[in-house]
Design a protein with these regions (language model features):
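Intrinsically disordered, low-complexity linker/terminal regions across diverse proteins
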Residues: 21-230
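Bacterial Sec-dependent N-terminal signal peptides
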Residues: 1-23
């Protein structure tokens, strides 16, 4: 069976990602962030639909109980703004010190009876910074990805962090990560280099790779071109 994965990739603390995609299922892997003025503050879901009638959807925190799954109603004149967390590491945000391991208690799966748009927005760093991402839904599922980020030129700050997150949509999904042969990378919570092979994920589980830019010269562009396959 070909197993599909969902992936997000980001530069520094956050990066905007295009237009949202209509879908009945949205996978939201965990994010992470740099320290200091990139610390996450308030975090929100923005959910809408072009459908005239009421559309029921459910937000399922990965690793949560049935009691923690919450249902909402949305229609084309009544979008929803839903608070995820007031600040800090949360169901959405993962401490970079805990990345590079299989994670089964971060991120979300959102299921709807009809198509919806899903985006996440947040403030950070004493409200001096903000970020957003949009979910591509089922259209973002695949078995092969290449990671791309901006170049980190000049004098990067201590809070600069490159990362990507992978979430499995099926049980017993094997993930392999290989980069573009940049040597001397310092990967958060991981003592070796790429390739990182045979990561086994069940549905909803995720794996995040993070590089603090100031840890090594290679970390500036160390994720560009990384191949993610399942």
């Amino acid at each position: 069976m070909i197993r599909k994965i969902f992936i997000f990739f980001f530069l520094l603390a956050f990066v905007n990602k295009g237009l949202a995609q209509l879908s009945k299922v949205h996978y939201i892997p965990p994010l992470t962030s740099g320290p200091s003025n990139a610390d996450p503050l308030d975090q929100w879901f923005y959910i809408s639909t072009p459908i005239n009638g009421d559309v029921s959807f459910k937000i399922k925190p990965v690793g949560g109980t049935l009691d923690e799954e919450i249902s909402y109603i949305v229609n084309n004149s009544n979008p929803k703004k839903i608070l995820i967390a007031n600040d800090g590491y949360s169901q959405l945000f993962q401490d970079p010190a805990t990345t590079s391991v299989v994670t089964n208690n971060k991120g979300y799966i959102i299921e709807s009876q009809d198509v919806i748009y899903v985006s996440v927005r947040m403030n950070a760093g004493g409200n001096a910074q903000a970020g957003a991402l949009v979910s591509k839904g089922d259209n973002a599922l695949g078995q092969l990805f290449r990671i791309g980020t901006y170049d980190n030129k000049g004098n990067p700050g201590n809070n600069y962090l490159n990362f990507f997150s992978v979430m499995a949509t099926e049980n017993q999904t094997t993930i392999n990560l290989s980069n573009n042969n940049i040597a001397g990378l310092v990967i958060q919570n991981y003592s070796e280099q790429f390739p990182i092979n045979n990561i086994i994920l069940n549905k909803g589980e995720s794996y995040t790779v993070a590089l603090k830019v100031t840890d090594s010269e290679g970390n500036r562009d160390g994720l560009i071109g990384t191949l993610v396959s399942s």
